[in-house]
Amino acid sequence: MAYRKLGRTSSQRKAMLRDLTTDLIINESIVTTEARAKEIRKTVEKMITLGKRGDLHARRQAAAFVRNEIASENYDEATEKYTSTTALQKLFSELAPRYAERNGGYTRILKTEPRRGDAAPMAIIELV
């Protein structure tokens, strides 16, 4: 299987991909280097496909990869409590139904100007 090393050890690379995948699920658009964006695309596509399957096994597989971060927090005035949704809940309740009719190709990579300082090629990766 071909992949990019991204100048990191395997555990550092896996942690970075988990973090960036979770951030993309939460924010639906992030700015990163072009090489990282191309690697994130693979993992995000797999996570959304797991979300579309929606069974217990798919939910557990996605939970093993996606970080347990809060995606949004709302205040309910009637009960005077905060309700929050995690990245995993957003994946299964919002993103999976949105892409139910689409067979792959859930992300878009837009190249931007090089980063100031080291001229690394930058890109915006976003959900379609």
Swiss-Prot record:
Coiled-coil region: none
Organism equals: Streptococcus gordonii (strain Challis / ATCC 35105 / BCRC 15272 / CH1 / DL1 / V288)
User: Which InterPro entries does the record associate with it?
Assistant: Ribosomal_bL17, Ribosomal_bL17_CS, Ribosomal_bL17_sf
* UniProt keywords, alphabetically: Ribonucleoprotein, Ribosomal protein
Listed name of the protein:
Large ribosomal subunit protein bL17
- Subunit structure comment from the entry: Part of the 50S ribosomal subunit. Contacts protein L32.
| Matching Gene3D superfamilies | Ribosomal protein L17
Q: Has the keyword Ribonucleoprotein been applied to this entry?
A: yes
State the superkingdom: Bacteria
- GO annotations under biological process? translation
Q: GO: which molecular function terms?
A: structural constituent of ribosome
| Cross-referenced HAMAP family | Ribosomal_bL17 (MF_01368)
Q: Name one GO cellular component term.
A: cytosolic large ribosomal subunit
Membership in a protein family: Belongs to the bacterial ribosomal protein bL17 family.
